């Protein structure tokens, strides 16, 4: 698949164009220079053709962090097949822009000069100044007004190869039901082949370092400056025939310290959690657990995600393994199902073990429990500890059935569902964990009457 890199200095409208092409607000847009710090990648449809588009950070030398941004942007340009170099049309062209553009031309890629912020015909008269760049492929546009953006996209589409068509042969002997079964089987296989993993944690615990260690390359910018990642970064890799997409989320600060663009980043982080399957809760092993860590862990409970607790910076940890685990279990009682792994993203020690653990907890997160076995376990649990009566009347679970996954959701069909105390539900959850491999996943238990629909009940996980 061809790659398109959007390159340019800060605040020329790169992320706005990226969002316009995606037809949604995906990258964070702000008047603050340097909002985009990592390279964002998305698969997009341009006309009848597909491509991967790369939104890069602004190219400008100001400090160490911006030098890293510049380096990653230029690496993206080298990796791309088509380069869209953006400039601010409200300013006169400067020598730095010309030098960068000419250096990009030497890469031998298809390259267009995109002059943004040309909002009307009068402003378009200034475009002749930009012919000094030495290219005929010049596109004066206004992303904010959607002015002449289509002309640019038509040019991009012409540079892309035609979409390959795949011919599928159908056995004429198959009847409709067999075809339907094949289709359903392919759908299930497709659904279970992709795992979305959110990397969560407070500012500067090493989330981006962990992402880079998992991918074995620097995809996310790492800096000693707290809060370097202010957008969510998606990166995919294949492991054991599974497509694992890591979502490096923005570091979450204390609520009182969240301002401006970081507030929007936090909202986007929460939105991304809605599509996540597994959460890696990253903690700094060189520091104690904070209230902020507990608040972030609350998002995992809120979105009912599978979870792995990652004690990062273990190479400089101040506590023994036993002490660290005890602290985690004491502070995160609602994540008692989550396995704990110690590692160092910096040295990459034990990082590779995360992959097998991710596959395991995802399998448990999406598992279907055999109905017969499930009911035997529930029946034995009631015999072992009878459900306390409610208002002087007996309370019984008639039968149990699993009605959904991610996480496993089990309906407890009862004579008096309102009489099942939360402590007994917790007991049942523990019994289920003793009998089934459910490490890493919450369990949702929903008491209900016969004939009551599952979606009418509240979700409570254990």
From Swiss-Prot:
CDD domains: EngA1 (cd01894), EngA2 (cd01895)
Molecular function terms, GO-annotated: GTP binding; ribosome binding
Name under which the protein is recorded: GTPase Der
Domain spans labelled KH-like: 367-451
Entry keyword annotation includes Nucleotidyltransferase: no
Stored SUPFAM superfamilies: P-loop containing nucleoside triphosphate hydrolases (SSF52540)
InterPro entries, alphabetized: G_ENGA (IPR031166), GTP-bd (IPR006073), GTPase_Der (IPR016484), KH_dom-like (IPR032859), KH_dom-like_a/b (IPR015946), P-loop_NTPase (IPR027417), Small_GTP-bd (IPR005225)
UniProt cross-references to HAMAP family, sorted A to Z: GTPase_Der
Record-linked NCBIfam families: GTPase_EngA, small_GTP
Residue sites binding GTP 2 per the record: 201-208, 248-252, 312-315
PROSITE patterns: G_ENGA
Disulphides: none
Domain EngA-type G, first and last residues per copy: 2-164, 195-366
Signal peptide bounds: none
Organism this protein belongs to: Nitratiruptor sp. (strain SB155-2)
Gene Ontology biological process terms, A to Z: ribosome biogenesis
Binding site for GTP 1: 8-15, 55-59, 116-119
Self-association state and partner proteins as the record states: Associates with the 50S ribosomal subunit.
PANTHER family: GTPASE DER
């Amino acid at each position: 698949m061809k790659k398109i890199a959007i390159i340019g200095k800060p605040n020329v409208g790169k992320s706005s164009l990226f969002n316009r092409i995606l037809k949604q607000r995906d990258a964070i847009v702000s008047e603050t220079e340097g909002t985009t710090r990592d390279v964002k990648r998305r698969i997009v449809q341009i006309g009848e053709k597909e491509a991967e588009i790369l939104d890069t950070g602004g190219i400008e030398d100001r400090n160490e962090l911006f030098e890293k941004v510049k380096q990653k942007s230029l690496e993206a340009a080298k990796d791309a097949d088509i380069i869209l170099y953006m400039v601010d049309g409200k300013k006169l062209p400067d020598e730095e822009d010309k030098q960068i553009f000419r250096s990009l031309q030497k890469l031998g890629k298809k390259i267009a000069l995109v002059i943004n912020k040309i909002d009307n015909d009068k402003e378009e008269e200034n475009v002749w100044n930009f012919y000094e760049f030495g290219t005929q492929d010049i596109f004066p546009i206004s992303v904010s007004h959607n002015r002449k953006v289509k002309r640019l996209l038509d040019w991009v589409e012409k540079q892309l190869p035609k979409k390959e068509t795949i011919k599928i042969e159908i056995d004429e002997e198959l009847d409709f039901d067999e075809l339907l079964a094949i289709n359903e089987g392919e759908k299930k296989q497709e659904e279970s082949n992709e795992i979305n993993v959110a990397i969560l944690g407070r500012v500067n615990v090493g989330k981006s370092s962990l992402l880079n260690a998992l991918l074995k390359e620097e995809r996310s910018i790492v800096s000693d400056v707290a809060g370097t990642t202010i957008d969510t970064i998606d990166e995919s890799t294949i492991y054991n025939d599974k497509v694992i997409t890591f979502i490096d989320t923005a570091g979450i600060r204390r609520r009182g310290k969240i301002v401006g663009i970081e507030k929007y980043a936090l909202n986007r982080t929460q939105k991304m959690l809605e599509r996540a399957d597994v959460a890696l809760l990253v903690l700094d092993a060189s520091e104690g657990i904070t209230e902020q860590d507990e608040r972030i862990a609350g998002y995992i409970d809120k979105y009912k995600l599978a979870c792995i607790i990652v004690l990062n910076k273990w190479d400089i940890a101040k506590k023994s393994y036993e002490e660290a685990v005890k602290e985690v279990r004491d502070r995160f009682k609602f994540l008692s199902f989550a396995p704990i792994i110690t590692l160092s993203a910096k040295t990459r020690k034990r990082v590779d073990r995360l992959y097998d653990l991710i596959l395991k907890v995802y399998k448990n997160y999406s598992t279907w429990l055999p109905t017969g076995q499930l009911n035997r376990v529930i029946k034995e649990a009631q015999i072992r500890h009878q459900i306390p009566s409610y208002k002087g009347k007996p309370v019984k679970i008639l039968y149990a059935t699993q009605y959904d996954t991610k996480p496993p959701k089990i309906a407890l069909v009862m004579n008096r569902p309102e009489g099942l105390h939360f402590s007994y539900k917790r007991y049942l959850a523990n019994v289920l964990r003793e009998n089934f491999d459910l490490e890493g996943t919450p369990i949702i238990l929903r008491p209900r009457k016969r004939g009551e629909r599952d979606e009418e009940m509240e979700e409570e996980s254990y």
